[in-house]
Amino acid sequence: MSKYRKLTETEIQQLKSQFCTADNWDDIEVALDFNPEHVSYTRFSGTIKLGTFDGEFILAGGMKKHAGLYHTTLHNVTVGNGCCIENVKNYIANYVIGDYTFIENVDIILVDGESRFGNGVEVAVLNETGGREVMIHDRLSAHQAYIMALYRHRPVLIERMKAVIEKYADENASEIGYIGNHVTIVDSGYIKNVKIGDFAKIEGASSLKNGSINSNENASVHVGVGVIGEDFIISTGSSVEDGVTFSKCFIGQACHLGHNYSATDSLFFCNCQG
């Protein structure tokens, strides 16, 4: 979806009648075939772009919910086609949200300032007093981590590797976060500076800060009830659930962490379980 238009006066009046407010209605752009019927009790501020709200979501138990915006506050947000965003306690700020994404009963989702979404975080592996830090990023491999941790007698190599990672992290830094297509975020708390890939499911997470959830259609990521994470990367096909607490961690592909597991300054590569 690339073409937008301003709201018509009739649409503005209809939105007002549906208890919507805006700091400036001129800052809102909508898809060419936008219909305001399914937008109610919503507050807009900053730059807003809205797609269409056609279609329904079929939830567990057969419950159906129509796409739309209900009881939410959006600030500097782009919403794709066919999304349902409902019952956001505080607000969503500085995000691009993809198509057919379902967000319900969350506290707050925001990006505050420029974020690198977990890229470039130094993880103190092997020696908890430091000296063998590994810089995590979306493309980290076990081989690269091994060299960074154990080849400290090659300082030129280590500095070059750090420079490459810093460059990647800076290139991916942004003041705008991303929530992909077909994402589900429900019954969750505080989500700040987190990039969320396609088809991810976040159900009941307590707090997620400064991280990347690198989910995709073929290998989705699940973040479950009570999870608390900060300074992290979660790779494709992994699940983190059942009250896991983790900080400064890289979680590789197809890993499973659960049962109140706790981790700090740790690297989990493919197929690990905790």
Language-model features: locations:
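Domain-scale signature associated with acetyltransferase and cell-envelope carbohydrate enzymes
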Residues: 1-274
